């Protein structure tokens, strides 16, 4: 059976989608925010891809940018992946629903079992779903409703699935994430701390917790691309983005920290974990 939580972060491949010029036009989630520097956003995205491929050693697949999908780079919202199963989501925004088509095909080509939501009353953004290695938490937010959470539970029946209220316009993974198989990291805002308290009340598993000054710093990815026993990585927002959280992140001593920047992409609503999908095609991962 192995150690509980040992499957967290196992990965061999990463999927990203290029940044289209339309992302800077204000048509997406960044409308009303400061103007987005397209070239800088594309550089950030390129560096992220480079870190996934070169630093972490993942097989990187990049879908081409599509001008009709300004928020296409936020493909973390389009699927929930665990083991060999990919649940294709139904994003809250109707304009974003065509984003799932290219992701579905890419995941099919990698041999994953595809599950469709198939309920027009359900909404689900992938970044509202947090997998701890032992269980799932699904944020009930502006973006994700009860029916969406029920479909997560129906799809991943081997795991407990609990719902966590998320206030405002945040996604759950914009408030908290996994710093390791037994460690939840969370921002210091009331919304983030409320989410962590709700998770603690719902779980049967003991998790350590680490509070970070910035909510956005908790949107990180714990990844284990190597062989069992190899030191895992934590892909996280670096000091150029969130300097106040770097000292706290150093307390995660059992991981190799890999900093990246997405401060420009953030203007379009991107959190770090929304910018890629990671998966394993290896057996027993």
Swiss-Prot record:
The keyword Cytoplasm applies. It is an enzyme of class 3 (hydrolase). Keywords: Cytoplasm, Hydrolase, Mitochondrion. Expressed at high levels in kidney and lung (at protein level). Expressed in islets of Langerhans. GO terms for molecular function: hydrolase activity. GO terms for cellular component: mitochondrion. Phosphorylated by TBK1. Phosphorylation inhibits the translocation into the mitochondrion upon Sendai viral infection. Putative hydrolase with unknown substrate. Does not hydrolyze N(G),N(G)-dimethyl-L-arginine (ADMA) which acts as an inhibitor of NOS. In endothelial cells, induces expression of vascular endothelial growth factor (VEGF) via phosphorylation of the transcription factor SP1 by PKA in a process that is independent of NO and NO synthase. Similarly, enhances pancreatic insulin secretion through SP1-mediated transcriptional up-regulation of secretagogin/SCGN, an insulin vesicle docking protein. Belongs to the DDAH family. This is Putative hydrolase DDAH2. The gene is Ddah2.
């Amino acid at each position: 059976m192995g150690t509980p939580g040992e499957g967290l972060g196992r990965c061999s491949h990463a999927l990203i989608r290029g940044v289209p010029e339309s992302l800077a036009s204000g048509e997406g989630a960044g409308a009303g925010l400061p103007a987005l520097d397209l070239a800088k956003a594309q550089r950030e995205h390129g560096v992220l891809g480079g870190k996934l491929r070169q630093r972490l050693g993942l097989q990187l697949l990049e879908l081409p940018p599509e001008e009709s999908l300004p928020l296409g780079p936020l493909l973390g919202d389009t699927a929930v992946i665990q083991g060999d199963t990919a649940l294709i989501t139904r994003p809250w925004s109707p304009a974003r629903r065509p984003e799932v088509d290219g992701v579905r095909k890419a995941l099919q080509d990698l041999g994953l079992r595809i599950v469709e939501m198939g309920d027009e009353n359900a909404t689900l953004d992938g970044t509202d779903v947090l997998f701890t290695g032992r269980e799932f938490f699904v944020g009930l937010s502006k973006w994700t409703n009860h029916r969406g959470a029920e479909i997560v539970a129906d799809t991943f029946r081997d795991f407990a699935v609990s719902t966590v209220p998320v206030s405002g316009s945040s996604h759950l993974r914009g408030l908290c994430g996994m710093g390791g198989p037994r460690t939840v990291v969370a921002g210091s805002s009331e919304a983030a701390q409320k989410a962590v308290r709700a998770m603690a009340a719902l779980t049967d598993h003991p998790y350590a917790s680490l509070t970070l000054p910035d909510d956005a710093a908790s949107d990180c990815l714990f990844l284990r691309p190597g062989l069992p026993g190899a030191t895992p990585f934590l892909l996280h927002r670096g000091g150029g983005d969130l300097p106040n959280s770097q000292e706290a992140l150093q307390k995660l001593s059992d991981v190799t920290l890999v900093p990246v920047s997405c401060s420009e992409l953030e203007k379009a609503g991107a959190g770090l974990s929304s910018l890629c999908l990671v998966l394993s095609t290896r057996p027993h991962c």
